[in-house]
């Protein structure tokens, strides 16, 4: 898996294909109707937002943790005083202790590499947005929520 850098490279590749080969990019326009294309691009934007939270950023002893996992652990930690302990034989729920251990155990070089990859995402998304806007104009999908998710991801990794 190539993480945030792979995601950025994929968006950049798709932007280039849209610029250079729009008439042949799947799904094809149906006599000027771009509804399927817009739907496919919306799907890509949704997946990009999801991946921003789901890609692994920390390596624990038995699993990797994503930004979504960190959020979940933080929420559980805040609600821990009201929660019952896990049933015997069931794994303990995700905890801030596990996240803290993973933060200590994840090599700094890995974290810096993840951050470098994530920092490529805003430009890659901007390239795709420009390519789509050039071809579809107002008919194209909105990029704002994906742009916000990408920006939030970069900000969180910079902390």
Language-model segments: which ranges?
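Polyanionic, low-complexity intrinsically disordered segments
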Residues: 1-5, 13-159
């Amino acid at each position: 898996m190539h993480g945030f850098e792979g995601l950025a490279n994929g968006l950049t590749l798709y932007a280039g294909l849209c610029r250079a080969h729009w008439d042949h990019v799947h799904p094809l326009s149906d006599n000027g109707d771009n509804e399927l294309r817009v739907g496919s691009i919306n799907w890509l934007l949704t997946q990009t937002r999801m991946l921003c939270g789901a890609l692994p950023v920390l390596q624990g002893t038995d699993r990797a943790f994503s930004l979504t996992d960190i959020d979940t652990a933080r929420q559980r930690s805040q609600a821990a005083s009201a929660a019952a302990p896990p049933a015997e034989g069931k794994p303990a729920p995700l905890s801030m202790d596990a996240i803290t251990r993973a933060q200590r155990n994840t090599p700094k070089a890995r974290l810096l590499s993840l951050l470098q990859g994530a920092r490529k995402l805003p430009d890659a998304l901007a390239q795709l947005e420009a390519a789509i806007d050039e071809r579809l104009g107002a008919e194209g999908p909105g990029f704002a929520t994906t742009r916000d998710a990408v920006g939030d991801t970069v900000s969180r990794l910079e902390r």
